[in-house]
Amino acid sequence: MKNQASSTVALIDYGAGNLRSVANALLASGLARENLVVTANPDEVLQADRVVLPGVGAFASCMQALKAIPDMVPALEKAVLEKGRPFLGICVGMQLLADQGEEYGVHQGLGWIKGKVTPLRPNDPSCKVPHMGWNQIGLTTDSHPLLRAGEAYFLHSYAFVPEDESTLLATTEHGGLVTAAVGRDNIMGVQFHPEKSQSYGLEFLSRFLDWNP
């Protein structure tokens, strides 16, 4: 796998992500502009060395928007699950990795990481929903090459509840433990926003650009 100096990154444009902020953060993390492909074209996804799926909004509408692009979901499955391309899902892009989400009804996700996305229910009344702002990242494993302890920026009302504890890579505290990152093999999903997390987020993205799982 190529490193960040030469690898192409497909940033999926499906009308449900803060593309400009994520694109700018990837460029600030070391990605060459000519290697960033903001795309809704499945063929470009298949040609890319790495894939980033952002997401802002509700689980159902994001999944619907992704499915509305002809052949996009099959292209993602081929690139990530078959070819093993490094994949990063951000916020709702991470939640879509689940089997299902419970926002505005029960809706099917990509099913790449077993689990479901459920409403945040803090056990401390001082912890408001949505969970918004800076919070500590606690690691459940010290061996994953992408993750470090530190502070990151969150904005969400629902959280990923993984079925397999081995896929839970990091948590944060918001009236109880909340999933901050999930992953397996070449797949990484983060609930926090790297593009809003200043140096912590840029360093995380830089490691993703060099990641060769």
Swiss-Prot record:
Molecular function terms from GO: glutaminase activity; imidazoleglycerol-phosphate synthase activity; lyase activity
Principal place of residence: cytoplasm
InterPro entries: Class_I_gatase-like, GATASE, Imidazole-glycPsynth_HisH
Residues of the active site: C91, H193, E195
Entry's Gene Ontology BP terms: L-histidine biosynthetic process
Subunit structure comment from the entry: Heterodimer of HisH and HisF.
Protein's name according to its UniProt entry: Imidazole glycerol phosphate synthase subunit HisH
Native source species: Zymomonas mobilis subsp. mobilis (strain ATCC 31821 / ZM4 / CP4)
Encoding gene, per UniProt annotation: hisH
